[in-house]
């Protein structure tokens, strides 16, 4: 306010919006609670170097995720000991490695990844690739990953 008090050239317009001055702990707590409730539903988003995933549904011995692989994102060349996976492409054209074979899938196409198979997803496109992943198995945790290659330095 010290600058405005000394200015000779001021214009003002009426602004009719909710306003809260963060001058007290009470106001800071109020804003914190608003933001906490707004983002509470997003707690199942997990960010990775290649993009992110959201846990959509977790049942007995199965887990449904939505994967979002950013442009030029590459998942590890990996395998799992306790789960198989089924991928359904909903957006983009991912390059899939399954054992020694490579495929390019389009929206609406799917692929089954048997337990113990070496696999990878790559997004060579400019827009994100979206995949619905169904995991089926006795252990459905991120610790069930053996990484053979990883462009982000996470290989075992």
Give the positions of each predicted feature:
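Left-handed beta-helix
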Residues: 1-111, 117-120, 140, 146
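Double-stranded beta-helix
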Residues: 43-47, 120-156
């Amino acid at each position: 306010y010290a600058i405005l008090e000394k200015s000779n050239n001021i214009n003002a317009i009426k602004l009719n919006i909710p306003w809260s001055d963060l001058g007290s702990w009470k106001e800071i707590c109020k804003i914190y609670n608003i933001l906490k409730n707004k983002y509470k539903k997003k707690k199942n988003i997990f960010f990775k170097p290649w993009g992110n995933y959201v846990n959509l549904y977790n049942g007995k011995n199965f887990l449904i995720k939505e994967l979002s692989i950013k442009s030029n994102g590459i998942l590890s060349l990996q395998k799992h000991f306790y789960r198989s996976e089924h991928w359904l492409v909903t957006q983009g054209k991912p390059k899939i490695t399954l054992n020694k074979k490579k495929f390019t899938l389009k929206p609406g196409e799917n692929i089954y990844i048997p337990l113990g198979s070496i696999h990878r997803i790559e997004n060579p496109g400019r827009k994100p690739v979206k995949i619905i992943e169904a995991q089926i198995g006795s252990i459905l945790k991120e610790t069930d990953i053996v990484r053979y290659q990883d462009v982000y330095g996470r290989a075992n």
